[in-house]
Amino acid sequence: MTAQVISGSALAKKVKTEVGQKIEQYVAQGKRAPGLAVILVGADPASQVYVGSKRKSCAEIGINSKSYDLEESTSEAALLTLIDELNNDADIDGILVQLPLPKHIDSTKVIERIAPHKDVDGFHPYNVGRLCQRIPTLRACTPYGIMKLLETTELNLKGRHAVIVGASNIVGRPMAMELLLAGCTVTVTHRFTTNLEGYVRQADILVVAVGKAEFIPGNWVKEGAVVIDVGINRCEDGKLRGDVEFAAAAEKAGFITPVPGGVGPMTVAMLMFNTLTAYENNG
């Protein structure tokens, strides 16, 4: 079997086009465009690339993005004060603080300071809690994007065994909730899991988010499985590789996401979607 490649780039383009069309309609009615505040603390090269792609997407579809590029030395108090100001700004519908933050700033405190209805990353405990209670509003962008990718396979997810490798707050944990919501039986594995191979081999749906190049050997993949590779790792040869050994996995899987061009573009697209949702909810 040769896997069908799920193009995140193509789906992301479709999502962004639909969001842009809705924004055009609102503006044509005399309403303001949605506003997104993007905060970057420090000059981490990877973060600058991510923030750049988010700002570019905003410009393409008509979201007013306001940039706040702060010095690495910015105090936690100063950042929290800025968030308070943005929480009270009626023209700002979404607030995004690019992670990771410098070590002297408590990221949990920062995430919790963002008003839940402006938390377009979907990281606030209130929004995570709503997902757990099966009443989601603003959902974490990467897991939500993955669910949209899974929809394109047209597979019935109910009753399927989904195995997640990685238990981060950003991907693994909310991903488990999304898959539960879709009717999957979910196993979450992490660095303390023994016999990881045994779990991976059982997976009808395999989501890998550990940040280690080709961490999962392709021959572990179950015949016909759906493989979602969240990892994006710059290797010594300069190439970008995912967390799954792509070529070998593609020989066994039914569907697989590429790296790059898989999950990454959908994360940005769902941020745009969430910003529109926040705008509509904020009325």
Swiss-Prot record:
Keyword Acetylation appears in the UniProt entry: no
A Gene Ontology molecular function term of the record: methylenetetrahydrofolate dehydrogenase (NADP+) activity
Residue spans crossing the bilayer: none
Binding, NADP(+): G166, A167, S168, I232
Any one of the GO CC terms: cytosol
Alphabetized UniProt keyword annotations: Amino-acid biosynthesis, Histidine biosynthesis, Hydrolase, Methionine biosynthesis, Multifunctional enzyme, NADP, One-carbon metabolism, Oxidoreductase, Purine biosynthesis
EC assignment: 1.5.1.5, 3.5.4.9
Catalytic activity: (6R)-5,10-methylene-5,6,7,8-tetrahydrofolate + NADP(+) = (6R)-5,10-methenyltetrahydrofolate + NADPH; (6R)-5,10-methenyltetrahydrofolate + H2O = (6R)-10-formyltetrahydrofolate + H(+)
Quaternary structure and partners: Homodimer.
Family membership: Belongs to the tetrahydrofolate dehydrogenase/cyclohydrolase family.
Protein name: Bifunctional protein FolD
Gene: folD
